[in-house]
Structure formats: structure tokens, C-alpha cells
Design a protein with these regions (language model features):
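Flexible, acidic/Gly-rich N-terminal and inter-domain linker regions that tether
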Residues: 1-5, 15, 42
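N-terminal [4Fe-4S]-dependent radical SAM core
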Residues: 1-8, 51-54
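Structural motif
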Residues: 4-6, 18, 87
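Residues at the beta-strand->loop junction immediately N-terminal to the Walker
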Residues: 8-10, 61-62
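Local cysteine-cluster metal-coordination motifs and their immediate loop/turn environment
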Residues: 10-25
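Conserved non-cysteine loop/helix-boundary elements of the Radical SAM core domain that shape
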Residues: 25-183
Length: 183
């Protein structure tokens, strides 16, 4: 019997490469998305046929999973056998989050969202190479909550180039004010 089996699905596509990111990502190969997702589904089906255990956790990260149409991303998730109580997380860019996307994720079995906030200070976001603005963070959290997610986290980064202690304090205050279950 397996005590736990985690699955990580990497979506390597990004609108822009963040300056701090060391992951394998591409900003110029979005035309490969359909083929990449088909390859993922094929690989998962073969793994299941070879006695892949039920997943106790699934994390869909990147890259930027939210660049992939939500229904297509859920078609990949649907191939994974899930254990009862499995935590299924999708990493999300605040620029991309919509209520419809979050509702599609919920209906597809996602039960946790990870929002890449990084900072709520404009010049810090720019130094990190992020494209969203602080206002998108509040809107994103509202969409996540409205879609019924009780579990979500806000990722933040400390020590970005040019970030002051006041900037960091502002980000912490802003994030705490949003009352996320996890940071």
C-alpha cells in the first residue's frame, strides 16, 4: 500500500519570463500547447495502465497554467486517478484569473488555488518582471472566493531588487488584509 503519491504537472508556457524564474518555461511556443496537453494525457494514461497509484496530491504549476484554457487543463486532470481527499492545486497568475476560470477549475476537481502575488508594490513587481498590478490581486482573490474555494494561498517573495523594508511591510499588510488561508 502506498502512503502517498504526489503528481506534479508542469505547464511550461508563459506570457513573459519572470526575472527570478529558473524553471523550464517558454514565451514563444504557445502553438505547442495542444500537442503538449495531448502528450501529457497520453503519458498519464500509460502510467495508469502500468499501475500508477491514486494521487494523494496534484500540483499543476509552471510556467503559467492559467494561460491554458481551463477546460483543456481540466481534461488533463481528469486522466489522473485521485485518492479520496486528494489536494489538487493550480498555480495562477493574477492577470489571468476570472470567475469563469475558477468555476471551471472547481467543477473539474481543483480544490486549492495558489496565486502568484509576489508583492503588492508596483516597482517591486516590475523589478521581478511580473506583469500584474496590485489591483489584480484583490480581484483575483474575490474570484477565487466567489467560485467557492475555501483553500487558497498567496505566494509572496521577500528581498527583491530595490525592495525596501517599507515595501515589504506594505505587502505583508495588504496580504493579511485579504485574509488568505495560507501564505
Amino acid at each position: 500500500m502506498h502512503s502517498g503519491f504526489g503528481v506534479y504537472i508542469h505547464i511550461p508556457f508563459c506570457a513573459k519570463k519572470c526575472d527570478y524564474c529558473a524553471f523550464a518555461t517558454f514565451t514563444d511556443r504557445h502553438q505547442l500547447t495542444t500537442d503538449y496537453l495531448a502528450a501529457l494525457r497520453t503519458h498519464i494514461k500509460r502510467s495508469v495502465a502500468s499501475a500508477m497509484p491514486r494521487a494523494t496530491s496534484v500540483f499543476i504549476g509552471g510556467g503559467t497554467p492559467t494561460l491554458v484554457p481551463a477546460a483543456e487543463l481540466m481534461s488533463v486532470l481528469a486522466e489522473i486517478p485521485l485518492a479520496e481527499g486528494c489536494e489538487v492545486t493550480v498555480e495562477c497568475n493574477p492577470d489571468d484569473i476570472t470567475l469563469e476560470m475558477m468555476q471551471t477549475y472547481r467543477a473539474g476537481g481543483v480544490n486549492r488555488i495558489s496565486i502568484g502575488v509576489q508583492s503588492t508594490v508596483d516597482h517591486v513587481l516590475k523589478s521581478l518582471g511580473r506583469t500584474h498590478n496590485p489591483e489584480n490581486v484583490q480581484r483575483s482573490v474575490s474570484c477565487v472566493r466567489e467560485a467557492g474555494f475555501e483553500t487558497f494561498n498567496l505566494d509572496i517573495i521577500y528581498g527583491a531588487a530595490g525592495e525596501t523594508l517599507d515595501d515589504w511591510s506594505r505587502t505583508l499588510r495588504d496580504v493579511v488584509a485579504l485574509d488568505p488561508p495560507h501564505v
